[in-house]
Amino acid sequence: MKFGYTIIYVPDVAASLSFFEQAFGFARRFLHESQTYGELDTGETTLAFAAHELADANFGGGHVAASASAEPLGMEVAFVTDDVAAAHARALAAGATEMSAPVSKPWGQVVSYVRCPDGTLVELCTPVHG
């Protein structure tokens, strides 16, 4: 088995794709003509976005929308970069909300957190060397 992709359910798939392209520099793989599903090429693993209506169709009991939660959900997407400060500034300039400015952790990693307009929590971090 291998990890295939991550799907984030969002209110506006096209808007999320555009934000992630602008904020993090990922390339759009495609946006379905229905505007309810799209993917970004992140290098190793596909990052996909799907409309809340698809989540409603997939999960009969409903789901918690990250965009509707005042606090971030208990999961994050992490992007590894050599320059966390620059990536953090780029994300903020694109419209992200700062959750935590870049900080050096005791194990030597630099980490920051932003929340995207669609509610997604993103960690920006340097590689872990161990």
Residue ranges of model-derived segments:
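Vicinal oxygen chelate
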Residues: 1-5, 27-80, 86-115, 126-130
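Short glycine-/small-residue motifs
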Residues: 121-124
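Conserved beta-strand-loop-alpha-helix junction that forms the acyl-donor binding cleft
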Residues: 10-12, 106
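Conserved active-site tyrosine of GNAT-family acetyltransferases
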Residues: 16-21, 91, 119
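Helix N-cap motif at beta-to-alpha junctions
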Residues: 12-13, 82-84
